[in-house]
Amino acid sequence: MDNPFIKYSRSDDYIIGNLKTLSSSYIPDNLPHREQQIELMARSLSSIMHGGIASNILLYGQSGSGKTSSAINVTNMLRSAAGDRVSIHYINCEIYDSHYSIMVHMVNSFIGEEQIPNLGLPFDRIYYELVKRIKSRNLYTLIILDEIDRLLSKNGSDSLYVILKLLGDTEGSIIGITNDSSFINKLDMRVRSRLNAESIIFTPYNADELRDILKFRINGVIKNGFIEDSAINLCAAIGAQEHGDARKAIELLRIAIEYCIRENRERVTIDDIYMARERFEMNILKESVKTLPIHSKMVLLSAILTQEVSSDIAVTGEIYENYKNICAEIGLQPLSTRRISDLMSSLDDLGLIVTTTRSMGRYGRTKLIKVSQPVAIKNYILEDENFKNFQGSRIVRQSKLRTNYDDI
């Protein structure tokens, strides 16, 4: 068999560097159009350089506005300048969503090979071990809490209170990262007072700034002329429309470049960017559906099946009855109507369904549900192993409640 990779070697004609610069995890040494925010962070943290206590910092801004990259960039420079005096911990609060898991993660970063378990040990022992290790090394601890609002939504102010107590018992500060502009107002007074953070705002990138960022990322990586200027401009325009999202603009360009490499195309055009956007959005949709809990998938499938026979609109009562039929076919116990209502609210928040409340006269008020992309979503749901024997349940319709929904 011929080597299947030979046909891709011609990409060397226009790829002269490492495409990791277009990876979402790549943190460049320079961040165009974030010089002001980086300088403000450096100024706030500068007291660490002469033995002082730095202010806590909160970074606000939309997704893709450079908050995380800037925080990591600044703390890398701090580590380079301060050396072993500073212990820096990056915590993604989507993954480590409690003070217990955060403390375990931090202790394990000091221990090395003999890691302590994520569960089972009393919290006061973990706390003691962490304080002891920080003090024995005479370290200044800087904790980056990415998506810090996740801690608040799950645990109230308690987790942040414990983290701030740790930094008070040792020496340290936090850099909190959030896209929730009202985050500080949701904290209780004891935590807000202890936090006393400086706020730094990351305004959305505009199209010109995104164009600069894209050109910076491909400079020295892609040969001139391989990507049409109009393609870069389109990526920047799409990112600007999405609240100045640099991450999306970079991802679109990466998908388009990789597609053109695979297809041995001569250059990246605006058509390739449109194709990349379609793939990008479908990937997000697929991932959103795949990661849903099983009962959320069954509710969504019920809405789709009901919608297929009901003029593209499903009534909540119909959805619940058909959901119970799906549960019976799959062999699971149905949840209560109240719990299903909560699941539908979550699906609405994710943009997978659109909910409208409509008066039904003497029948009262009901919610009408429309699934946004029913064909694609149905296919993604049925890829789940739990649905491998699903044959299609009998569809219930509440004809008394059905009126004219053509305007929805």
UniProtKB/Swiss-Prot annotation:
Entries under CDD domains matching the protein: AAA (cd00009), Cdc6_C (cd08768), HLD_clamp_RarA (cd18139)
GO molecular function, one term: ATP binding
Binding site for ATP: S65, G66, K67, T68, S69, Y205, R217
Keywords for this protein: ATP-binding, DNA replication, Nucleotide-binding
Highest taxon, organism lineage: Archaea
HAMAP family found in the cross-reference section: ORC1_type_DNA_replic_protein
The protein's role, per its UniProt record: Involved in regulation of DNA replication.
NCBIfam families named in the record: orc1/cdc6 family replication initiation protein, PRK00411.1-3
Protein name according to UniProt: ORC1-type DNA replication protein
Native source organism of the sequence: Picrophilus torridus (strain ATCC 700027 / DSM 9790 / JCM 10055 / NBRC 100828 / KAW 2/3)
